[in-house]
């Protein structure tokens, strides 16, 4: 198939292609880095259980909603709400999703650049080029941060210019199996090391006394970010779906892939932390586990250096390659959302749209590269608050504007007997009551 260069909408070549692309959007640093470190710092197996419940009971219903809106409209998040309703407010909701995606991508690419740099640091450290290795691990060096972020953005732009099937789908079909293979290989190695089983027990044996309201809302926020909800990515990906596809089934596959890889990442990172502890590397600060950033960018590299030799270098390179692949799969979907908006609403062909939007985001990324203190504020505004707000308003759109009858009419494509199914009885309850209430409470809790 030729590369998509016109303003015509693309489509997925296969069901597997969509599942891998949507799962690739979901499986990013939030799964490989964020989820394991939150499990480790906020409740162990108790957090894992709450996260799984939030993902299936809140994340999955919203995912079905986003995909159905996308496929019914065949448009980007802004255009989707224009097509499906005359309501003037909800296109602004779609625009908010586009803005959130752009701003998340702007700081995400800086963090992704750190991971990419650390992969080379391991090689330079092994070769004795210590000064170069220290430069690559100095997150306070703005020029280095900017260079790595630009490299990451250029790779993302290049993939997006290829279109839906030849760019996004082809890239994720390669990266997802590679990602899973790397995780499993590293798990097998880590499990042979002293201290690993202590980490496994911490991860898999629940202590329900550690469940608190804060833990529940942290797990809910993690589920939202992990599944790429609320920013329009799944509306955009849904707009490329064939009418013959069963959306609830596809959403279930994507959710299972997301939690499955998050679980595997936890099975790698948490035992690795305790292997580091067994090797004499301090993983606690006082009574508290070190921060997530320290765990990934200080403690694990120290472990690889302690192992030393070819094995230590290989593990370090492979681990940070894993983070880089996970990040790239997410930056693809984050950039596709505003690119789709420009293509649909402004009728600019894909290649020009990708470069125009991509370079705009890159400029913001470079600013953040020199002011990394902005990352925390941007993450709070556009991720911690922005994504749940988007998800809440999507629920309200289906409940009060588009109505469930229209939603079910769309879902009947690919699932002809949906109105007779258990899903038809349960989904509206979650989408109208449980999901909005839980999400709203989560948003409010950020201000209390």
Task: Identify the function of each model-found stretch.
Residues 1-34, 62-67, 71-84, 88-95, ...:
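Membrane-interface "cap" regions at the ends of multi-pass membrane proteins
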Residues 6-9, 37-42, 77-96, 109-167, ...:
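Inter-helical loop and helix-membrane interface segments of multi-pass membrane transporters/permeases
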Residues 34-51, 70, 85-86, 114, ...:
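Transmembrane helix-loop boundary segments of multi-pass membrane transporters
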Residues 324-334, 354-364, 382-411:
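Hydrophobic alpha-helical segments of multi-pass membrane transport proteins
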């Amino acid at each position: 198939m030729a590369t998509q260069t016109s303003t015509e909408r693309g489509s997925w070549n296969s069901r597997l292609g969509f599942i891998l692309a949507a799962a690739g959007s979901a499986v990013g640093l939030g799964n490989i880095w964020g989820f394991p470190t939150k499990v480790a710092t906020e409740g162990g197996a108790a957090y894992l259980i709450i996260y799984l419940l939030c993902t299936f009971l809140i994340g999955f219903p919203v995912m079905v909603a986003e995909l159905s809106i996308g496929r019914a409209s065949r448009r980007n998040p802004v255009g989707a709400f224009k097509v499906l309703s005359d309501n003037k407010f909800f296109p602004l909701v779609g625009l908010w999703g586009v803005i959130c995606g752009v701003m998340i991508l702007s700081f995400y690419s800086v963090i992704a650049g750190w991971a990419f740099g650390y992969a080379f640091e391991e090689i330079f450290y092994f070769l004795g080029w210590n000064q170069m290795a220290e430069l690559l691990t100095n997150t306070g060096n703005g020029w280095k941060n900017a260079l790595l972020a630009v490299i990451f953005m250029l790779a993302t732009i290049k993939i997006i210019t290829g279109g839906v099937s030849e760019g996004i789908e082809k890239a994720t079909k390669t990266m997802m199996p590679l990602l899973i293979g790397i995780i499993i290989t590293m798990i097998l190695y880590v499990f042979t090391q002293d201290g690993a089983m202590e980490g496994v027990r911490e991860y898999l044996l629940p202590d329900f006394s550690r469940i608190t309201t804060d833990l529940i809302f942290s797990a809910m926020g993690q589920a939202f970010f992990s599944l790429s909800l609320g920013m329009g990515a799944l509306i955009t990906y849904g707009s490329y779906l064939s009418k013959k596809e069963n959306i609830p089934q596809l959403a279930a596959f994507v959710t299972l892939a997301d939690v499955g890889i998050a679980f595997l990442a936890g099975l790698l990172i948490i035992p690795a932390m305790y292997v580091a502890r067994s090797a004499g590397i301090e993983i606690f600060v006082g009574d508290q586990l070190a921060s997530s950033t320290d765990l990934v960018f200080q403690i694990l590299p120290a472990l690889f250096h302690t192992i030393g030799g070819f094995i230590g270098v290989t593990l370090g390179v492979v681990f940070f390659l894993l983070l880089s692949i996970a990040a790239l799969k997410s930056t693809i979907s984050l950039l596709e959302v505003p690119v789709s908006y420009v293509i649909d609403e402004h009728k600019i062909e894909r290649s020009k749209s990708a470069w125009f939007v991509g370079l705009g985001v890159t400029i913001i990324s470079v600013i953040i590269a020199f002011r990394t203190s902005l990352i925390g504020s941007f993450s709070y505004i556009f991720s911690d608050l922005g994504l749940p707000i988007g998800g809440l308003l999507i629920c309200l759109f289906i409940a009060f504007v588009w109505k469930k009858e229209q939603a079910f009419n769309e879902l009947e494509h690919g699932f002809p007997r949906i109105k007779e199914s258990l899903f038809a009885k349960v989904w509206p309850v979650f989408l109208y009551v449980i999901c909005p209430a839980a999400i709203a409470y989560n948003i409010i809790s950020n201000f209390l």
